[in-house]
Swiss-Prot record:
Protein name: LexA repressor
NCBIfam families: lexA (TIGR00498)
Protein species of origin: Bacillus licheniformis (strain ATCC 14580 / DSM 13 / JCM 2505 / CCUG 7422 / NBRC 12200 / NCIMB 9375 / NCTC 10341 / NRRL NRS-1264 / Gibson 46)
One GO BP annotation of this record: negative regulation of DNA-templated transcription
This protein's encoding gene: lexA
Feature: DNA-binding region: 28-48
Keywords: Autocatalytic cleavage, DNA damage, DNA repair, DNA replication, DNA-binding, Hydrolase, Repressor, SOS response, Transcription, Transcription regulation
One Pfam family per UniProt: LexA_DNA_bind
Length: 207
């Protein structure tokens, strides 16, 4: 295993988590904020050392082009910092979202992504209605369970037809608008909507 300083390990772990969560690497500024480095040049120095050690590859012409190379080397998160989050299959009307019959499996996530004092679940996305929000077909959204939402929140909602959908929420004068993030799709206009939760993150497997 390659010898890394704690700071280098923290940076590598953060890059991996961000790629898994969002599908693309963080910026130098985001890396600095995550590991407590105010100087971008210091972050660049650590990235250069990680590149020298063969753990990442960078494209100097693109600010976010950081490729993880140590695919066979796992960075382990201590078990006491992991939360097993239920992955919901079919959402059934009239039953709690995390009812046993709705759960397909459990997925381990770092506490930073799924705080243990909050009720969090995951849901697989089917379709391309939220692609402009960076949520793609077959992604898993990380959802904080709640029954209210603010305008502009991305939510999991149960429609009047008892169908669960992930859309951006807007409460307007005479109705509720569930807005897709895809210019080819029309909004869903409803009188009543049941909010199941607010999307707080995205998990993607890079093929």
């Amino acid at each position: 295993m390659t010898k890394l300083s704690k700071r280098q390990l923290d940076i590598l772990r953060f890059i991996k988590e961000e790629v898994k969560r969002k599908g693309y690497p963080p910026s130098v500024r985001e890396i600095g904020e995550a590991v407590g480095l105010a100087s971008s040049s210091t972050v660049h120095g650590h990235l250069a050392r990680l590149e020298t050690k063969g753990l990442i590859r960078r494209d100097p012409t693109k600010p976010r082009a950081i490729e993880i190379l140590d695919t066979e080397e796992e960075i382990h998160i201590p078990k006491n910092q992991v939360v097993n989050v239920p992955v919901i299959g079919k959402v059934t009307a009239g039953t709690p979202i995390t009812a046993v019959e709705n759960i397909e499996e459990y997925f381990p996530l770092p506490e930073r992504l799924a705080p243990p004092d909050e009720h969090v679940f995951m849901l697989e996305i089917m379709g391309e209605s939220m692609i402009d929000a960076g949520i793609l077909d077959q992604d898993y959204v990380i959802v904080k369970q709640q029954n209210t939402a603010n305008n502009g929140d991305i939510v999991v909602a149960m429609t009047e037809d008892d169908e669960a959908t992930v859309k951006r929420f807007f409460k307007e004068e005479t109705h509720i608008r569930l807005q897709p993030e895809n210019p080819t799709m029309e909004p869903i206009i409803l009188q009543n909507v049941t909010i199941l939760g607010k999307v707080i993150g995205v998990f993607r497997t890079v093929h």
